Structures are given as C-alpha cells and as structure tokens.
Amino acid sequence: GLSVLVQSQGRNLIYDGGGRGASSFTVSYLQQQGVTDIQYLISSHYDEDHVAGLVGCLNAFHVEQVIGADYVQDTKIYESFMKGVEAQGLSVQHPAVGTEFSFGSGKFTILAPSSISGDDNGNSVVIKLENGSNSFIFTGDASAESEAAMCGSGLDLECDVLSVSHHGSATATSWEFLQAAVPELAVVSCGADNSYGHPHRDTMDRLESMGIQIYRTDKQGTVTAVSDGTTIKWNQAPCNDYSPGDESDQGTQPEVTDAPDQTVMVWISATGSKYHNKPDCGNMNPDKAVQMSEADAQAGGYEPCKKCF
C-alpha cells in the first residue's frame, strides 16, 4: 500500500492511507505526529491498498476537504469511504488538472488525471507538492498512459523526489516520465515479500540507469523527509537497492530488429536513455546534446524517443 503524511505550519495533508492491515497503524502514526485535524485528505484512487486507511482517518479525525478521482467503484471499501466522507458533511472534490492549492508554507498542484477511463489505476490523482525550491510528486498507481498525458500537459514535472507509481510495477515509471521529472531521489512504497513481485525489474533498471537514488519501504520501513524550502533532510540514507521484489523477474527482453542505418545521425542528452532526431526534443539541453550514429546509440543501450521518432 501507500500512505503519505505532509505537515506544514500546523496543517496536515494525507495522500492515501494504506490497506486494511495498515489502517490502525496509519491512524496511530498520525496521532503520534500530533494530528487532530486534516486539511486535505486525498485518495489517489479507490483500490483497497490505498483507500482503506483513509476510512480510518475519516473516523478518527476532523477533515476539511476531500479530493479524489471522479469515478465510482463497486466495492464495500469504496462504500465505507463515501459514508465516512458524508458523515463529515463533505463531498469528494474532483479538481481539474493544473488546479493549485495553498498548503502551509507551500502549495500543491493537480497533475492528473486529465480524463477518466476504465483503468482505475490510470485514474489516480497525481499531485506535485512544492515548498520553496523543493518539490515532490506523488503518483498513486498512475499508469504509463497517465504519465504520457502528464508529459503532454505543459505542466512542470521536474521534482526532487518522486513517489514511484504502483509500488514499482512495470506498468508505469516510463522513460518519458522519468526524463521529464528528472528526480534526484525516488521512494518505492511496497510490502516486504509481497505476492506481486513489486518492485519489478524493468522499473528498477530504469531508475538505476538514470542514477536516481532510491528508498524502499519494504527494506527500510517508514521514510521521512523534512524540507526547509532549500534542502531536504531524511531520517535515513537511501538504500539504493535496485533488486526486484521477485528475483526470478528477468524484465523485458529486447526485441531483435533490423540493423540500423550507419549513416543516420541522432542526438542523445547528457543524462537521458533515449536518442532523438533533434538536439532540443522535450526538456533536452541542446548545448549538452551529443551527436552520434543511430547504430552507435543503439549499441550503447539507447532507445528511440517516442516523441520524435
């Protein structure tokens, strides 16, 4: 599951609450942090492992605003969540992408979803939290399709810290999204020895290849970060353990393709993992782009950019 508590100037925001097994822990942890009122309670989506703990919070604390995805789920836990919202005299808000909310010394912006589909994970509410020059993105279980929509939204996706989508599943954390967000650190929230094999090898390989340091709750437990608007201090060092949850996970094997034309020239960025047909694609810095043949780029492990190829 996933649960994030944000505190600033006496105000509290909770993003997801974890599953049933963690609900009492979530409520107890918030009480230990002095929480009595929650200004923003955000449910990324309504899967049990994200929303169950929020039901406990609705029963234990006074809540001022509830934000969630604009769809209905036919489950008992969703019904319990909605009853808890109604008992507070509230309704679930569905703010549009780009909507900003002030919070303590900072603010947060809605990045997704831009539309609602039949994919519950893809409907996840994604937010970017900013405090001074520090920024964090919380993704819920956002899908690769949702990430692509965010990349095309024109919103600023760069962040210092990324909460990795869907517990490190290979269904998200795409190259395109990582290259737009360029986080220095990532947090993977997943249960130890979970039955899904989270995090998946493909995702961890992408994080490692971009030099993104990682925290993992399955290895390190609760992770806390304190931002003063300039620097971020953590309660522990990153574990930088990029191994998959299931050691038998071999990841996606590359497809065999025809040999590339040696005369085709492409561009690569200083830190990216894709090659481009122009030096200023996306967030690339053309002054730092390097030109080489397509054959050499592929031999170096680079993949074609989906935007310009």
Question: Can you name each region flagged by the protein language model?
Answer:
Residues 1-258, 282, 306:
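Non-globular, low-confidence helical/coil segments that flank catalytic cores
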